[in-house]
A protein has these predicted regions:
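Beta-strand-dominated extracellular/periplasmic modules and repeats
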Residues: 1-89, 100
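Short beta-strand edge segments in extracellular beta-sheet folds
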Residues: 91-93
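Compositionally biased low-complexity segments at domain edges in trafficked proteins
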Residues: 95-116
């Protein structure tokens, strides 16, 4: 089944990004629509795919990871974090494939890629 999934690894503490809020948006032309809002589980993953099946369509998407709130809870970073919301915009061109968007994050940096 085709679907979109994500996974967050906190490379600052060496643990999954437990409790991070993630919002998913879909762009129809220039109109941005929120598809879902989830909280990552103990493994830093959503309990369900972010989107799947007939709701999974070609186009431009955006994931917003609320990492500033997460790091404020687990570290002594300043009140104004260096990274607050990490926004990843990406395209889905083949709805027959599984798309996985992992995020490796610290209070000062992040990296992403198309996973499997």
């Amino acid at each position: 089944m085709t679907k979109l999934t994500t996974h967050v690894l906190d490379i600052y503490s060496g643990r999954p990004g437990k409790g991070i809020k993630v919002d998913l948006y879909y762009y129809n032309n220039d109109k941005k629509t929120k598809i879902s809002s989830i909280i990552l589980n103990n493994d830093g993953r959503p309990d369900q795919p972010l989107i799947e099946g007939t709701n999974f369509k070609e186009g431009k998407y955006e994931l917003v990871f609320f990492v500033g709130d997460y790091f404020k809870k687990i570290t002594d970073i300043p009140k104004v974090p260096f990274l607050d919301d990490v926004i990843i915009k990406f395209g889905i061109s083949n709805v027959e494939e599984h798309y996985h968007v992992p995020l490796l994050v610290s209070p000062w940096s992040y990296s992403t890629y198309r996973g499997s």
